[in-house]
Amino acid sequence: MTSANIDDSEFRALRELSAEVGVDPLRTQGAGGNTSIKRDGVMWIKASGTWLADALAHDIMTPVRLQPLRKAIADGDPRAAAAVDFVDAQLNASGLRPSIETSVHAIIPSPVVVHIHCVNTIALAVRYDGESLVRERLRPHADVALASVPYRKPGLPLAHAISERLTKNTNVFVLANHGLVVAGETVAEVADRMTRVCEAFFAPSRAAPQADTERLASIVEGTDYRLPQDPATHVVALDPKSLAIARLGSLYPDHVVFLGPGLAEALLDGGRLRAPPERRRPPLMMALPGLGVVLHHSASKNAHAMARCLADIAARIPEDAPVRVLTSAEEQELMNWEAETYRQSIGR
């Protein structure tokens, strides 16, 4: 059985909502984000490495037995981290692994849970004063029961942090340096609440000049670098304030996972492109201040999506905002993580 074959209007509605947020780069980028629905002791959750944008075209949901997974989380069973041992093999026609965030969805009691990487949310959630700003923005929304969650590594550590702040009424979780989780009884309820929360967090994007793509193309000619798939990516190098934000360090996990830590800046030697000498490997993404952005020819679709995401987020953060970036230790625990390596192999 597949989730696409289940005759249930809520399943259909979740697939439609998943696809809707999946094609909106301001809500979800690449293989990021995940959705779930709980039915008859089974939680159907987006499979690792799949794209929410494909929810209507492909079977992207994996069935997980809820009760044993919750017990494993409570007991400190290390199998809860990957959750592969709790997949219902008879229902899992796709054979895919569950999302890295399966434990997060499992500990939230609500039947429907949606986790997105909303750029307006992240632009607030990377700030040291973000929690107070978030609460102020959500004050007019009486139905929102908020939990502000400090940064933790995605997956089981994040699930434990959420569990410590979870009440029976909590339905919105703002995750520091990460994103947004919205929960509810029905897909329609979650969709409405998510839309209102994202609108409450709206921030205008700073304007930037257009990139001189002809000049950039001539600079990368004969090198291993290419222009980004989305021209909006160039903003992070063209807007000095956005570039200053990006230079601070890694703002959220998927940047590290798909692009590597921080932001490399290319050097021009007689008009020829050179990577910064301190980088042991060719960076997947490089900024040319005042000119634009280039990506390595090996960069995946996910990497291109995350490059655009960085531009979108940085352009929404005021230049004087107190920004928290991931520490070196937090970056290291995201790199060479087996679960993320698998996700990248599926999502290229």
Predicted ranges, named:
Residues M1-R348:
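Glycine-rich flexible loops
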